């Protein structure tokens, strides 16, 4: 947990006598929250007329109203509001929010989240172990409880299919577990096909975690893989996208994290997956909710509190939903004795809720950090002193000159393998299109709704790998869009209708050492600079959210049919059916490279 002194809480083992004295009224509490209804995540009930006694950043007791007779304790009047445990997000990627861990903390606490379990495979793919450890140092200084699920699949596939900046081998992963107490689990094992097929490296990574008693998080598509996946030691996944696979996973002993996200993004699988409970009758006891990926704007507007309310919207009782958002995530990682509930001895990570489960105020380690939906001075001070990443993190975009960004125009009839983009943007279709000889590319674009897509290796590990492709149905009619957040190897992906605008976009990203941008008529019309590893801004979350909002407006004006976070997934070579990396077009079911054109 955070090592920031102002928010640190002593281990329970050193506080038992103190807490027992406070609970028995032999010692004054530091803080008493009065006039509250308590949401018990243990019994899943609302308890009227309660007060919460806090000492040393921990809960001493929850008592009937009027139990505190007066003394030196600070009093807080909840005015009939709901006091609940802070939310626990069991699966997120901080880097998707494009902010540092310190900046992320502000948005999390505003939304009532006090603990997160972060898989930092994004920065691991760029900077290897050094990136993961820099993120851990950032997390240690952030005013939030941040635990690491060690990245398990870096790179996502093999060097034959893509070039990554990092390579987290079984030995490196084992060393991270041994060095960092915050490393509590193995992050999502995305290579579910190699796991199911018994791949040696994949299972050596599993052994590095399981041999140390660490749980393993997963990522699996396809009911046919569930049995082998569970048998390999994977015990949670956030990729339960419908009630069928969710039911299979629960029966196989795998926790499921219902992922909720704005409908315009690829992340909103909760409405379908929750039907394993509401329609098939499964218990919710091994079900939690998570956010997975959020940009900075959506992080503020659609936090884990919103996902919890979505669970209510789709059939759960409020008490059940809040338990899924707090206690269940804690229990999955064996931390229910520390967080996730209001039991005696637990950390005083609390949230005051309105009747519709909207966070109003937040306490972190017994300190009031959000009051009436505004951050307090103690939190503002902590946020104003962020961790400084190593200098190497600011120099990760390494591009050769004179890159060829578009394919040659075919001079004979060919069959083109195109990438079909459809909402919400997770899976991409493999569509072949016959291209007859034409005077220019625009004729093909107009006839088949195509545009260029190019991936450029940016880690300085190749002689400048550049792969060309064609997007089908992306909607871009002019200009270019580009990003240094091309999952998961985070090479640069640029789409456009002409090489000149694509080059302007690439130059802008190189100049800022990372970012996402839109270019029209040779000018950058919107950009979110990401100078840290080409993934993160060094600004506060509200500043980045404003930049993201402006980017989205220009993105829509350009005609793009999928949001930029979906665009960032186009190189993700572990999700069907077809992807593009710096090595070329990847046919995911076969895990082979395909040429862009074949003779008709």
Curated annotation (Swiss-Prot):
Keywords: Hydrolase, Manganese, Plasmid
EC number: 3.5.4.2
Superkingdom of this protein's organism: Bacteria
A Pfam short name: Amidohydro_1
GO BP: adenine catabolic process
Enzyme class per UniProt: hydrolase
Cofactor dependence: Mn(2+)
Presence of the UniProt keyword Manganese in the record: yes
GO MF assignments: adenine deaminase activity
Coiled coil (residue ranges): none
InterPro entries: Adenine_deam (IPR006679), Adenine_deam_C (IPR026912), Amidohydro-rel (IPR006680), Metal-dep_hydrolase_composite (IPR011059), Metal_Hydrolase (IPR032466)
Reactions the enzyme catalyzes: adenine + H2O + H(+) = hypoxanthine + NH4(+)
Family according to the record: Belongs to the metallo-dependent hydrolases superfamily. Adenine deaminase family.
Name of the protein in question: Adenine deaminase 3
Organism annotation: Rhizobium johnstonii (strain DSM 114642 / LMG 32736 / 3841) (Rhizobium leguminosarum bv. viciae)
């Amino acid at each position: 947990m955070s090592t920031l002194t102002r928010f640190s809480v002593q281990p329970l083992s050193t506080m038992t006598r103190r807490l027992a004295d406070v609970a028995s009224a032999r010692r004054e509490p530091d803080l008493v929250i009065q006039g509250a209804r308590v949401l018990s995540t243990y019994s899943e009930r609302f308890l009227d007329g309660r007060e919460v006694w806090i000492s040393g950043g921990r809960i001493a007791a929850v008592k009937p109203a009027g139990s505190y007779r007066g003394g030196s304790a600070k009093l807080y009047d909840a005015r009939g509001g709901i006091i609940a445990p802070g939310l626990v997000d069991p699966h997120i990627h901080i880097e998707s929010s494009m902010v540092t861990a310190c900046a992320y903390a502000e948005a999390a606490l505003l939304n009532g989240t006090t603990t997160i379990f972060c898989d930092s495979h994004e920065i691991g793919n760029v900077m290897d172990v050094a990136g993961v450890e820099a993120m851990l140092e950032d997390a240690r200084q952030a005013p939030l409880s941040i635990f690491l699920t060690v990245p398990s699949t870096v790179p996502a596939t093999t060097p034959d299919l893509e070039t990554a900046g990092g390579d987290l081998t079984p030995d490196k992963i084992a060393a991270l577990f041994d060095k960092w107490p915050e490393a509590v689990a193995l992050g999502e094992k995305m290579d579910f096909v190699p796991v199911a097929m018994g791949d040696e490296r994949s299972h050596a990574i599993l052994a590095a975690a399981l041999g140390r008693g660490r749980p393993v998080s997963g990522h699996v598509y396809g009911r046919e893989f569930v049995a082998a996946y569970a048998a390999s030691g994977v015990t949670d996944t956030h990729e339960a996208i419908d009630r069928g696979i969710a039911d299979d996973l629960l029966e196989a002993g795998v926790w499921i994290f219902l992922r909720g996200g704005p409908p315009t993004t690829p992340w909103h699988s909760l409405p379908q997956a929750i039907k394993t409970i509401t329609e098939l009758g499964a218990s919710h006891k091994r079900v939690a909710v998570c956010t997975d990926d959020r940009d900075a704007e959506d992080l503020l507007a659609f936090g884990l509190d919103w996902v919890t309310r979505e669970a209510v919207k789709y059939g759960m009782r409020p008490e059940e939903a809040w338990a899924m958002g707090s206690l269940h995530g804690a229990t999955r990682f064996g931390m229910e004795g520390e967080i996730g509930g209001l039991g005696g001895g637990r950390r005083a990570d609390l949230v005051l809720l309105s009747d519709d489960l909207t966070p109003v105020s937040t306490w972190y380690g017994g300190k009031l950090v959000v009051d009436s939906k505004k951050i307090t001075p103690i939190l503002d001070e902590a946020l104003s002193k962020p961790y400084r990443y190593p200098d190497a993190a600011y120099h990760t975009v390494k591009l050769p000159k004179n890159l060829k960004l578009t394919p040659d125009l075919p001079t004979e009839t060919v069959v083109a393998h195109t990438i079909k983009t459809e909402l919400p943007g997770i899976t991409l279709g493999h569509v072949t299109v016959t291209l007859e000889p034409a005077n220019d590319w625009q004729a093909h674009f107009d006839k088949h709704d195509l545009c260029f897509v190019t991936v450029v290796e940016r880690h300085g590990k190749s002689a400048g790998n550049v792969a060309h492709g064609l997007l089908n149905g992306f909607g871009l009619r002019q200009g270019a869009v580009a990003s240094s957040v091309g999952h998961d190897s985070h090479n640069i992906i640029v789409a456009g209708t002409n090489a000149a605008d694509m080059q302007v976009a690439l130059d802008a990203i190189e100049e800022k050492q990372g970012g996402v941008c839109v270019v029209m008529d040779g000018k950058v019309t919107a950009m979110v600079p990401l100078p840290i590893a080409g993934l993160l801004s060094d600004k506060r979350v509200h500043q980045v959210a404003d930049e993201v909002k402006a980017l989205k407006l220009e993105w829509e004006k350009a005609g793009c049919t999928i949001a930029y976070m979906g665009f960032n997934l186009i190189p993700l070579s572990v999700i069907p059916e077809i992807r593009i990396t710096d090595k070329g077009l990847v046919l995911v079911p076969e895990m082979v490279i395909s040429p862009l054109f074949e003779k008709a």
